[in-house]
A protein has these predicted regions:
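Classical Sec-dependent N-terminal signal peptides that target proteins to the secretory pathway
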Residues: 1-20
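Long, ordered, amphipathic alpha-helical scaffolds
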Residues: 196-201, 205-283
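Post-signal peptide N-terminal segment of secreted/secretory-pathway proteins
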Residues: 65-114, 118
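Residue at a conserved register position within TPR or TPR-like alpha-solenoid repeats
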Residues: 55, 89, 124, 158, ...
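Alpha-helical repeat scaffolds
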Residues: 60-71, 96-108, 130-144, 169-192, ...
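N-terminal leader/linker segments that initiate helical-solenoid repeat arrays
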Residues: 18-83, 91
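Alpha-solenoid helical repeat scaffolds
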Residues: 80-84, 115-122, 149-159, 193-194, ...
């Protein structure tokens, strides 16, 4: 099974209106008695975490880890930073002992079981501890079978290659499944119960969309890939600037892959070429 690094939102909200990641962090850490100074710094650091995997400068990532470690020492209840450190340690290859210490703090102070099960699952997957992974995974499916976060977990366990195989044999059914998950990502009640912020909901939506887009690109169906992206992530479905900033590297990667395919297939057809660039907002 492929190792998975996922950056998940882990914080609760009390009403049916979704909140931003920063609002969720402020609310949950305040309940733990963490100072406003530390909360503000946590929000600042957290905004850069989704882009760690795409950051080419290892020194920059290591400096970020040092800064997070310094803030975390001021209050170990800050489970947001414990989660962030695990993600950074995965990216730079820190040893398992340091990851486990942060996981223990994360599980101790994060009050939301659904997010703990999901994130711990990703930790065990990356570590290769499949016994612990299977235990958590079955518990997640049993206790939260209809939750968005469970649907996402199941999709990741299935994996890209298996999804591609289904699309080759029954594209309509595979797309219906991916579209149903993406629709849940737009449903504020569904994201609320899974403790997912607005920014992270769109990140998961992008990930589900990438399964289909990458399949189309692999099959040399560039126009289908571009149209799928436009219909789901641009136009009326384009999110706020705050959400785009949080997901800027993931979104830019997908756009870049589409732009390259568009150039290869349609550069000599200027009308189609430019129309497609406009669809993915690369003009």
């Amino acid at each position: 099974m492929k190792k998975i690094i996922l950056f998940m939102s882990i914080l609760a909200v009390a009403n049916i209106n979704a909140k931003s990641r920063s609002e969720m962090i402020r609310e949950d850490l305040s309940k733990l008695g963490i100072s406003q100074e530390i909360i503000v710094k946590t929000i600042e650091l957290d905004k850069e975490i989704p882009n760690v995997v795409s950051e080419p400068d290892r020194g920059k990532i290591e400096n970020m880890a040092l800064e997070i470690e310094k803030v975390l020492k001021r209050n170990e209840k800050n489970f947001v930073l414990s989660e962030n450190l695990i993600n950074i340690y995965n990216a730079i290859g820190k040893n398992d002992t340091e990851k486990l210490n942060n996981l223990k703090r994360y599980e101790k102070y994060n009050p939301h079981e659904v997010s703990k099960l999901f994130f711990s699952n990703m930790y065990y997957s990356n570590k290769g501890d499949m016994e612990s992974f299977d235990k958590n995974y079955e518990k997640l499916k049993e206790k939260y079978p209809d939750y968005l976060i469970t649907r996402i977990a199941v999709t990741y366990v299935i994996g890209r290659d298996a999804i591609w195989n289904v699309m080759k044999n029954d594209e309509k059914t595979a797309l219906a499944t991916l579209n149903s998950i993406m629709k849940m990502c737009d449903d504020k009640i569904k994201t609320e119960e899974s403790r997912i912020s607005d920014e992270q909901a769109w990140a998961y939506k992008l990930t589900m969309g990438w399964f289909a887009i990458s399949f189309y690109l692999n099959e040399n169906r560039t126009q289908d890939a571009i149209d799928f992206y436009y219909e789901n992530f641009e136009g009326k479905n384009k999110p706020s600037e705050e959400i785009l900033y949080y997901n800027r590297y993931q979104n830019w990667y997908i756009k870049s892959e589409l732009a390259k395919a568009n150039k290869n297939d349609f550069y000599n057809n200027k009308k189609v070429f430019e129309k497609n660039l406009n669809k993915i907002k690369m003009l």
